[in-house]
Amino acid sequence: LGENWRMNRTLSRFAAETLYGTGYAPATDVIGRQRVVLAPPASRGLPGEEECVGWILDPAYPLVLCVLENVRTTVENPVEAALVARLTRALRERLTDPGSGEPYPATEEGDYLFWRHGLFIVSPHHAQIGAIRTHLAGVRAWEYPPFVDTVDKMQGQEAEAVIVSYGVSDVETALGEAEFIYSRNRLNVSLTRSRAKCMVFLPRPLLEPPLDLVQNEKAAAGLRHMLDLQEFCRVHGEERTFDLGWMEGAAGVRLTVLRARKM
């Protein structure tokens, strides 16, 4: 693989360094310079929410890893789903349509275009997809249904921004479906759908599994890709931890955010 006609420089660079080799780069300067453009926020969030959401969405940082600490759930992770919904609400209000330079209008057509070109949300598990859809319904009255689905449904698709939500934070569950949860190909496809911004949610236990996992060659390759993502964001950006006490049901939960800057 050489030229890439989709992703900006930061997103291409991660794929180049980890999988495709240094020749893999944006086909043109215009593609390489793509970034999301956000209008100023129309409404104020909860204290704590605004800062956390703003830090994750900052257009100057195209690749963001969000690691939830102190959460133990199996295939459905309500805290992660609620965070994804809040990020989505902020993007729906603020993300501008590259065609018009204006935020997507608050109409059925606006919702359709937002989910067609602006954002989609990827999750490996139907339980987590259901949890995200439930939380999305709670943050806004959508006139066109949100695009939340598995990576298989996203192949060949692209959007300005993508949110990837793994959800699974129970090690036994992850080990039971290791080749699925730790599929390097699935993670790679998820990471290479967006043109300008990719935000990945990985609960801490997935990044620190028991040693049994490395005996499975395919799963070990996927874990290595997750750890490479963490390292890439650390080396090329900055890290900050947020207390999620402002969220319902998230007492004691922390979110470590690593974001790789625009290259």
In which residue ranges do the predicted regions lie?
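Conserved coupling/interface region of RecA-like P-loop/ASCE motor cores
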Residues: L1-V37, T192, L207
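Hydrophobic alpha-helical scaffolding
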Residues: L1-W5, T74-N77, V122, F180
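A short acidic, often aromatic-flanked loop/helix-cap motif at beta-alpha or helix-coil junctions
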Residues: N4-R9, R33, N70-V75, K153-Q157, ...
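Amphipathic alpha-helical transducer elements in NTP-driven molecular machines
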Residues: W5-N8, S12, A81, A85, ...
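Short, surface-exposed amphipathic charged segments that create phosphate/polyanion-binding patches used
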Residues: S12-T18, P40-S43, E160-Y166, V257-R261
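Conserved helicase/translocase motor-coupling segment
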Residues: P26-T134
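Conserved helicase C-terminal RecA-like lobe
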Residues: A90-T192, F201-P209
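Helicase C-terminal subdomain and adjacent C-terminal extension
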Residues: A137-R140, V171-M263
